[in-house]
């Protein structure tokens, strides 16, 4: 876990988002839960792209209190406490990659399954209230998958239902998954993570 506690020269005024575009219509139509008939949920073998509607349905089913699912240019100040899922493209675009964050008083807990620093406008939004920003620095998702929406949902699910301080929950969540070690091919670890995430959703959702 890393923390940005002050306006520092960390970001260099640039968006570091280099996420792979996984869909040109994520905002409206995904290949996720809406394509899964209820009678076949247990047969799901891969977590695919989710639209904003998919995400809302799943979060509602899992009883995750959600402030909303937004494109990155749709936020307004003041930012209220709560759970958010955000797409890293603007509202006039089709959508690229889902991330999640929690605002709790003066703290922001930001999770990107690719472990990429948030775009500049989100950094500015978070810091507008002099918030502390906690973010993950280790990649969990394979670049060959489109499961970012599922990663975002499970992050909020874990943070909401687990015990302990939010800082402790954030640390424990990141410890659950494999991370690339020196001289190790990243996809080996990431594929294990994808399999674990699918197993988790089969237990908490596809059952």
Predicted feature residues:
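Cysteine protease catalytic domains with a Cys-His-Asp triad
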Residues: 13, 22-99, 103-108
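Exposed alpha-helical structural elements
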Residues: 54, 121-125, 172, 196
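Residue-level detector of alpha-helical secondary structure
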Residues: 5-8, 12
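Terminal export signals
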Residues: 1, 28-30, 36, 40-43, ...
């Amino acid at each position: 876990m890393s923390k940005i506690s002050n306006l520092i020269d960390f970001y260099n005024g640039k968006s570091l988002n280099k996420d792979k575009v996984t869909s040109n219509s994520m905002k409206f139509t995904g290949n996720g839960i809406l394509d899964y008939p209820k009678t076949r949920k247990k047969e799901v073998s891969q977590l695919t792209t989710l639209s904003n509607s998919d995400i809302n349905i799943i979060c509602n089913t899992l009883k995750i209190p959600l402030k909303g699912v937004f494109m990155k240019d749709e936020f307004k100040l003041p930012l209220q406490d709560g759970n958010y899922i955000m797409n890293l493209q603007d509202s006039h675009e089709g959508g690229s990659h889902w991330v999640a964050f929690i605002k709790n008083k003066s703290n922001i807990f930001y999770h990107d399954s690719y472990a990429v620093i948030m775009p500049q406008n989100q950094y500015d939004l978070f810091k507008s209230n002099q918030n502390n920003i906690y973010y993950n620095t280790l990649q969990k998702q394979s670049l060959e998958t489109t499961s970012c929406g599922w990663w975002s949902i499970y992050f909020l699910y874990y943070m909401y239902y687990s015990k302990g301080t939010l800082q402790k929950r954030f640390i424990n969540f990141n410890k659950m998954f494999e991370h690339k070690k020196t001289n190790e091919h990243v996809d080996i670890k990431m594929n294990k993570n994808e399999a674990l995430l699918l197993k988790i959703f089969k237990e908490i959702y596809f059952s």
